[in-house]
From Swiss-Prot:
This protein is located at the 30S-50S ribosomal subunit interface and may play a role in the structure and function of the aminoacyl-tRNA binding site. Disulfide bonds: none annotated. Belongs to the bacterial ribosomal protein bL19 family. One of its GO terms (biological process) is translation. This is Large ribosomal subunit protein bL19. GO terms for cellular component: cytosolic large ribosomal subunit.
Amino acid sequence: MSMDHLVRIIEKKYEKKEIPDFRPGDTVRVHVKVIEGDRERTQVFEGIVIAKRGSGINRTFTVRRIGSHGVGVERIFPFHSPVVEKIEVVRKGKVRRAKLYYLRDVKGKIRIKERRD
């Protein structure tokens, strides 16, 4: 048995099964488990998916939202992290790029057409 095969077997154990299908341009709501001292709570981060990268257990996606005072906030979430409790797709967006890094430079309200599947 090769080392690569062993790594895949171990990774399979930690993969999450209930990940919804979403693409860059979609608006998602990510429920993140936050531990502060001895308290544990769920924090919701909602924004536009601007990138997906990696493969297997190392897959990540980047979500961008406009926070308070018009400051853009980006967070990178691993797909299979135990910290990510749930991912909801709020709205499906229609874009022509796999990486939407150009949204970092856009001022004002960002318009992404809605995809109808």
